[in-house]
């Protein structure tokens, strides 16, 4: 699907709606021609050219089409490369609950043994991401490897005073490590159990460091695709993506499947 920007009403009055529509169709056809349309058609892919506000139009078409998944690049023709995601990606994420696969420069290998990482923090959004994977198992290949990944802040050295009250005894490193393991277990358990119940092999991985960079670094080194919820604990829910999801999306080279929890 290709959506062309709307033209001013004065242009429509000057040239006529039919001429404008023809221009849109020709411009959209050029986009599809660059993709190799014959190869797409052989796979049952149909082409559609629309015009209007791009994010709004795509969201409305996804609703009409009853799309199960939206696939798009994270950046289009917008030259502001400093933005974490393209404006169209952000706008569409804000308007739809349909899961979105955001493609970066790194293309996943053509294999049925994808290395799939599910990022969780213990919130319902991580559980929703895992639920999507289990309900759409065929999308990832018969031999895919699944890893549930959780990030934890490093334990300070020397160990800081008791966080509840500085007048209480300082927590030992062993106590801090035990708490870190407990939080990790609580975060991954609700995701691990459904996979095991479905008879699927899954492992859990704890990465230590700033969540944004630690998760992205792990993904870039170990994963072919990332699945994550759009938000987690401590994020401003009115934002399109939570801060961690936004930064991971910006720093990760692999495709990211973002699940928008109902």
PLM feature spans:
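Internal alpha/beta domain cores that form substrate/cofactor-binding pockets in large enzymes
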Residues: 46-65, 81-83, 87, 95-98, ...
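Active-site phosphate/pyrophosphate- and oxyanion-stabilizing loops and adjacent acidic/basic residues
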Residues: 37, 90, 131, 213, ...
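Glycine-rich, Arg-bearing micro-motifs that act as flexible, cationic patches
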Residues: 72-91, 113, 225-251
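A short acidic, glycine-rich active-site loop
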Residues: 17-30, 169-183
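Short, ordered loop/turn segments at secondary-structure junctions
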Residues: 3, 75, 105-107, 151, ...
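Small/aliphatic-rich secondary-structure junction motif
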Residues: 1-16, 113-170, 193-205, 261
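Structural beta-alpha unit
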Residues: 8, 15-22, 26, 30, ...
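Intrinsically disordered or low-complexity boundary/linker segments at protein termini
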Residues: 42-46, 69, 90-141, 145, ...
